[in-house]
Amino acid sequence: MKCIINRRAQFSASHRYWLPELSAAENQAAFGLCAQPYGHGHNYVLYISLYGDIDDYGMVLNLSDVKHVIKKEVTGQLDYGFLNEVWPEFRETLPTTENIARVIWQRLAPHFPLVRIQLFEQPELFAEYTGNNMEALLTIGTHFSAAHRLALDSLTLEQ
């Protein structure tokens, strides 16, 4: 029988949006506060979805082993790091949520039967990557409230 299991991990890191081919004014215009010299940080939440057969012990994979690989390959390297410098992929590419999710996939794919990577930059903003080259999905959630009147036209406001 097949099953998808999910493992959650967290790390805190900072990053900066800056393209060397653009001038300082162009970077500031394109990226606003994200282009500040010292960057800015996030508390990232990572979900790794893995797919496989349930073995005789009732597991797809030993989650303790999964935890150790994630720490070795991802969170142990990124936690409290400056993403633009920690991984070489981000020296030439912006460390956007989408790109970070893609690179995490590339680093974990040799170890696991990955189905999906979800990386939350904040509760309302996350990227989802499923291993299809650069087709990452970026989702932004929002909330709104509206007042409305539920009444019959024949009733007065007081009724």
Regions found by a protein language model. Name each.
Residues 1-159:
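Charge-rich, low-complexity N-terminal segments
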